[in-house]
Amino acid sequence: DVYKRQEWERLQQADLVIEAVFEDLAVKQEVFRKIDVHARPGAVLATNTSYLDIDPIAAATSRPQDVLGLHFFSPANVMKLLEVVRGAKTAPGVLSTGMALGATLKKMPVLTGNAFGFIGNRIYNAYRRQCEFMLEDGAWPEDVDTALTGLGFAMGPFAVADLSGLDIAWRMRKAQAATRDPRERYVSILDQLCEAGRLGRKTGAGYYAYVDGKQVKAIDATVRGVIEQASAQRGIIRRALAPEEIQRRALLAMVNELSLIHI
């Protein structure tokens, strides 16, 4: 049986518990403390975090050996990839259960180490970051999205950001702020859009504007202004980027990040 509710006593009947609250470490730790109290001994306890360190989450329980990450990609009923995340104390049998669950659900389970963003989001972040660089360098969101859908992507990165919500990436960036290398190139365009309340489709505006859920084709002057200001602050003379350059830079960013991953 599958239960989706907050009746904690039902956890005593569960062989596997999956937490799926929003990406806030303190909130997840509090949920796991409650799960630890109510779940039966030997139950597998999983977090659906997409990028947080799962070890502090596991440490909130008295049984970190039973905790692992099961990162389902959104929308979970469609996306095949399932990251099975190994914590420092995760027992081998618990990992085997996670992999078996993925196969049972007809997913593609991939075992990954406990690094920020795991595999999929780490590569995607490198891709998105390069696309943000291209905004500062002279491209517009529609230039980048059109070039990459032309390469075969179902959606471009800025359309994806609007669909999923810009605040998701914003929250992740704020979580990384304390450890970010000050020498690293950082593009604040997304931050400024979020501060202006432009969180994507759900607020009617993000990188693009929307009316009744449909993207407005007209150029968004507000977004153009934010991008032009970002370029000027960095001293960049904007230039047109050909689709081939956009495609090449995006792909090479992903290839480079993949080469740095040690599972």
Segments from the language model and where they lie:
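N-terminal glycine-rich phosphate-binding loop for ADP-containing cofactors
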Residues: D1-I261
